[in-house]
Amino acid sequence: VPTVDALAYNLWGSADVVCPLMDARRQQTYTGLYDFADGRMNTILPQCVVMIEEIVDKINELGRRVIFLGDGVDVFRDYINEHVKVDYDFAPAMCNKQRASAVACLGQVLYEQGRAENAADHKPEYLRLSQAERERQEKERDFRI
């Protein structure tokens, strides 16, 4: 179950666009955009890592009310307050952390859709390289020049 999707699932049934924000450091956030209709969660923007400016621009383009949640809310609250042009709100603090119940419920939905895998085939899906990997690539690039 993708982490950002599971965080969004904490607000299952919301009438608003749901925007999870997980602090990825350096003004970046792990995020995505979701809504709920016809008894299911729909992905507007799949989970990704972007600069906070990029997700705010996308939200403003959508033109719909949005609710933010996640540990990135506290990090980016001032930026959101200054730059989001649509109606928005922040989820209650109790919704800002991963919940095993949301992961399990979303996992069941994915299983019913045939999107299951066995433990031997499971591999984590990293949205970006680790800092050590990025620094190694940078050094290798500098060495080639």
Language-model-detected regions and their locations in the chain:
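Acyltransferase
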Residues: 89-145
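Surface "functional belts" at beta-alpha junctions
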Residues: 1-97, 112, 126, 131
